[in-house]
Every structure is written in structure tokens, then in C-alpha cells.
Amino acid sequence: VNERSRSVLVIGAGVQGLSTATVLAEAGHRVRVRTSEHPSGTTSAVAGAVWGPTSLWPVERARRWAERTYGVFLELATDPATGVHSASGIVAGRTEFPESPPGALGLLDGVRPCGAGELPPGFAVGLRATLPLVDMPRYMEYLSDRFLNAGGELVHSTVQSLSEAAAESSLVVNCAGVGARELVGDPGVRPVSGQHVIVENPGLEEFFVELSDVGEWTSYMPHGQRLVLGGTAVEHDWDRTPDPQVTEGILRRCGAIQPVLHEARVREELVGLRPRSDSVRLHTEHYEGARIVHDYGHGGSGVMVSWGCAYEAAGLLLADLDD
């Protein structure tokens, strides 16, 4: 047993909570995760998910988090059991990208502009890139197993208040996602619902992601037999019930780009609540005798910064503790 081993409470079992808990448990600490939802029921499990094209604030920190995460995903992509693989595909826009290259794509070599013939009708700009794709249900299972194998404990119980958390442990990481709105009383965090349609993959190996600032766009991400189609964003919407009309719209938009998808068999329709905020909240607070590191507000980009945020959160939590 590590003599400097600490007891830590992590709130939330989405991709932020489980990644941070894994970093801490693998460093020899005693980590308990408390969650109101099984990892497979979190918003993270509904994500597409692709590393790279979306933007986050604060920009410089987010770029650093994304870079660290990219390195981890490249390693994980060598093992099929993780659910991570590298795929080639297109990031496109119907108008010019607000920043070029968008998101964290500027960190990569080998990203190149699409030729005229590569873009579907209606698109003005596009980049071809090879990016990590993450099959989130499989990945969340992998992360849970990895955390438990490192000696971690996963408990299904909702943390009702920061006082309750501080009473349980003097070291707390808050990865409550959109739940932070109530838990911390942070009105700046709001749900942005997003619907995905899962279809049987008719054989597509490339991804397509449209960057859009309106509430709907076109994307598809292949994960073996499963293809995740998107997408939508509805601000201030707490409803996790899939809408059949939204499904129709997603299928129609994706079919316009890949006609083979008009015939694809729908397996399931899923809705997640992205924890949107004007900026990621990753900082330390001293509260009722406990050190609480907040790590929430990642919007729709939580997966792409997950390992970077996890290492930074763990570092903040353990900084300057007496030896």
C-alpha cells in the first residue's frame, strides 16, 4: 500500500469522472465514485464520439487538454477492446469555418483541405483528417473495468450537496456534468440536449462531421457494426425522450450525403444532455474543510479533453499535500 495513499471521492461516472478516478486509482489512491447513473446511462455513453473538431473555452487550456487526450487515444486505439480506433474522414461546413483549422485539428499533421469532388452538395469547405473515434458504450465499459481493476469503488448513490461530499472525504472531485447546476448552484451550466440515431452500419469506414452553429447538423461515425448518426442541439432542454421527427430529420440529412443510409436499419435512438457553459470549470475550491476540484461544463467536447482534464484535476487535488 502506498503510504501517501489518500482517500478521494469523485462525483459522477461520465467520461470526466471515470477518467479522473482512474488516474487517481492507478496512482495508488483509494477512490470512490458516487454516481446517480450507471456509466452506461450517462450522457457520455450517448456521445458520437470523435476527437478534435469542436471548440472549447478557455482556448489555450482546452488545446493542451485535447493534445494530452489525443496521445492517450492513439495508444488506446492499438487495442480493439477499448472501443477506440483511428479513422479517416471529413470535417465539413456549409459556410467557412469560424476558425481554421477548427478546434484542435491544428495540432495534427496530415490534415488537408478537401478537393472540390470530395465534398457533398451544399458544403463550402472541408478538411480530410485521420482522427480517433470512440465507441462510447464500449469505451465506458472499458473505463469502468479499468477503474475497478485499479482498486476503485463505484457506488450508485446521488450526492445531494457539496456539504455531504465534504463530510465524506477531505478530497473531492466534482464531475457532475449538468448536475453541477444544482449541486454547486451554478446557473451558468445548462443542458443542451442532443439526439443520436444508431443504425446498422452498411459498410462505411469513414466518418463525416458537419460543423454548424445552428441546432442541427449532419454527422456519422462508424464503430464496426454500429453507425452513430447525428445530430442536434437544443438549449435548456432536460428531456431525454427521443423525438421520432428528429430521428427522421437525422436520417434524411445523413441519407442526402450517403444514400445507402436511407435503407439503414435503426437500432436505437438516444438523447444526452451536454453540460454547456461559457467555459470549462476546472479549478480548486476549499469548502467546509475539504479540497474540492471542480471539473464540469465541457459541453459537447468532454470526450476530446477527457484525459487532459483528468490529469490536471488529479494534479490540482493532490498539489502541496503534506508528505
State each model region's role:
Residues 26-45:
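Glycine-rich FAD pyrophosphate-binding loop
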Residues 19, 166-252, 256-265:
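Flavin-dependent oxidoreductases
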Residues 142, 264-323:
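C-terminal catalytic lobe of FAD-dependent flavoproteins
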Residues 123, 127-169, 175:
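Helical element adjacent to the flavin cofactor pocket in flavoenzyme catalytic cores
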Residues 58-68, 126-142, 241-245, 305:
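Short beta-strand to alpha-helix junction loop
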Residues 84-87, 154, 259-271:
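A short coil-to-beta-strand element that immediately follows conserved catalytic motifs
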Residues 48-123:
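Dinucleotide-binding Rossmann-like beta1-alpha1 core, especially the glycine-rich loop
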Residues 7-32:
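N-terminal Rossmann-like FAD-binding beta1-loop-alpha1 element of flavoenzymes
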